[in-house]
Amino acid sequence: MVYLVTGQPDLFENPNYKLMSVEESLQLLSSCKILQYDSETTGVDARICDLLCVQFGNKEKDFQIVVDTTTVSILLYKSILEDKYIVGQNLKFDLQFLYNYGIIPRKVYDTMIVEQLLYLGYPSGTISYSLASIAQRRLGIDIDKSIRGQIIWRGLDEQVILYSANDVRWLEDIMHSQLKDCEEKQCKVGAKLECDFVPVISYLEWCGIKLDEEKWLVKMKKDKENLDKARESLDKFITSNPNLSQFTHIERQGDLFSGFNSDPICTINWSSSRQVVQLAKILGFDTTVQDKKTKEDKDSVLEKHLKTQKGINDEFLDLYFAYQEYAKVVSSFGQSQLNMINPKTGRCHTIYKQLGAASGRMSCGSQQPNHALAKLKGIPAKDCTYCNFQQLPSDEVTRSCFVAEEGNLFCSCDYSALESRLGADIYQEHSMIEEFLYKSGDIHSLVAKACFPELKDKTTEEIKKNYPHLRKKAKPIGFSQQFGGSARAIASSLGCSLEEAEDIAAAYLNGFPGIAKFKADGSKAVRQKGYVLMCKYTGHKMYWWDHQVWLDRQKSFTQEFWEEYRTRHKDTGDAIALSVREHFQAASKWDRMALNSPTQGTGIVILKSAMTDFFNYIVDNGLFNRVKIVALVHDEANIEYPINLSMDVVLKECMEKAAAKFCKSLPIPAEAAVGDHWIH
């Protein structure tokens, strides 16, 4: 049965639903343990737009209640929303509109988030997580969403009321279906952790972060100057090299007023990769890479490709990389940040995706326009998008532009050597655990000791003091090996021969038997099971989505197959050769995932657990909207709070306690920095 609660009953009489008073609705809702919840709004930005209606449903009692919040105060339902167990779809969105009224639900189940958890690892676009798609996939039910885009301009009418009610009809059924899968896949603990984090990430977006506009304008001017200087240096590199005259032009014409200039002028547009490719080839660089999607060769001058060719023309690489860096800063972190400032809050509000990567890590930002904010500020919608704070330059000048409000402090708190410490625990690499627990904690020196025979009998303290050059070499080795890198990657980073790099890689695994065992076991497990267990405590898994295809292909590799392959493999366009290449590339990729995903996956579980505890402290102590969570970047938490509170101590304690729950062999300390701006 569909009910409508409204302050204007005379306008909404209809045989398709029944009118109900506020008191009657509260009585019915109070009798339920679980409530399905959704809301319709006047727009997508909770800090600008408002509620149009909210919907409650319950499967056992078979009702849906639509509350017209334009005539009935949502505050009348505060205790219901905060006390009952709420099931919803993409609740991060709905909660922000409730936060505007000081309503803070924390007992929530999000069908979208749990569905994403159950399909972690599937490529973007292969699975839809909309309510309609989930209902069709799990229940075989078609949910009509044709009115969704019309609600903003239609307002509340008969069709919108019935549409809204239908959105809270099937959520419990979806939840029960998902929980069966969670039980089977042993990830119910992970599902609860992710659902508990939904109110936190919603609060993170709702709080936003304050940007000092004057400081930012000064930074923008300096960035533009740096970009101009980088462009001039590249132009000079061309014009001063006679062998590159094809990329110059001499202006023969002039006049008596401006004079005559016979100096060569660079004709390359440094923002055009096509033009830079032509230059790079002439300078001797190999610009050919394989397109990941089409598997066809293409030209590239991306830094990650060119930096592997050091020694060909390092002067050009240094100049070009500097230009690319400044160009990215100017285009991505300039006026767009100022456009993000919400006039109503005076703060920048962005979008976070809770399960933004296959590892379970969050992602940040979106090129989707904020139409409500653009309209409010009177700027084109295309110029009003959401900033990616995870890619924000970490230099002091940039970070110092993000500040605390007057009377507040800004605290940045991050984990010390999170992935190294966590890796030591997960791999059960005893030499690393002992280094952290009883010695200097210098993992780079420990890696150097394992990889370079001349350091075999040296202590890590001696290596750091007397062999800094080898310790420096050990840094990229350790990083590469912990993340499943090949000997070729070591050779590229150190500039050594492949044979020498292979010896170093072998020495690394010999020196760290725990990592070697974990690597071998992980490779075997992922090939057999088709997933990587990223956190053994929560059951978070990364699924090899086309694992069955890989297994079927593996079975087809018979003796007859290999005999045919040997006669045709040199033909790179041959279907058999391509199939073999793809097969072993997939195996190599998942071997790497099996090694490095557990540290990344458990790392983000730790941060989510910590911030959930911190958010609960905020709410339990009446500090909602006084203590703000303003940014989460990888393993770093940033908060803002009144100067008379010691929230840095609370945050540090929450982070260290969370780490202790998931890292049993050694502590992971958190380090807090407090000031009037973003310090880290």
Question: Predicted segments — roles?
Answer:
Residues 511-512, 653-663:
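A common structural junction motif
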